[in-house]
Amino acid sequence: MPKSGLKCPVSSFFLLILYSVKTENMKILILNGPNLNLLGIREKSIYGETSFEEYLSGLRDFYTMVEIDYYQSNVEGELINKIHEVGFSYDGIILNAGAYTHTSIAIADAISAIPCPVIEVHISNTAKRETFRHVSFLTPVCR
């Protein structure tokens, strides 16, 4: 749990990466897809009231030995470009592709094309939401 006391949806995934890869001088990208720039103000009953900037600050405070970069885009091609850009040099990507999770073969192909481990995360429980959110094109290629 980050020092700020915030419940962070990606903190347990950080621990997984930290203990499965290495613990010093790690470089991780948190990559968020469409509408995640609205965390804290969008559908608070589903996504909560905490902005991603607050989560990110807590993660950086807690995981001081890790270089944490962050990128968010509402544009599919920009997410793919970022995966290509960092996928050969970073230690891991934590990806919340938002709605692209359920639609994007192109993002799945981008993940398949890189050696960097990618972990798929979501803030809400997609299995308990609309039926179309139960399918992920990304899960089979994440590692």
Predicted features along the sequence, with ranges:
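Short beta->alpha junction loops
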Residues: 69-77
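Short, glycine-/small-residue-rich phosphate/pyrophosphate-handling segment
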Residues: 128-143
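Short, acidic/small-residue loops that bind anionic groups at enzyme active sites
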Residues: 113-129
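Short Gly/Thr/Asp-enriched flexible loops that form oxyanion-binding sites at enzyme active sites
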Residues: 104-115
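Short acidic/histidine-rich motifs immediately flanking catalytic phosphotransfer sites
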Residues: 86-93
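Glycine- and acidic-residue-enriched helix-capping/strand-helix junction motifs
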Residues: 38-53
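Extreme N-terminal starter segment of soluble prokaryotic enzymes
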Residues: 25-28
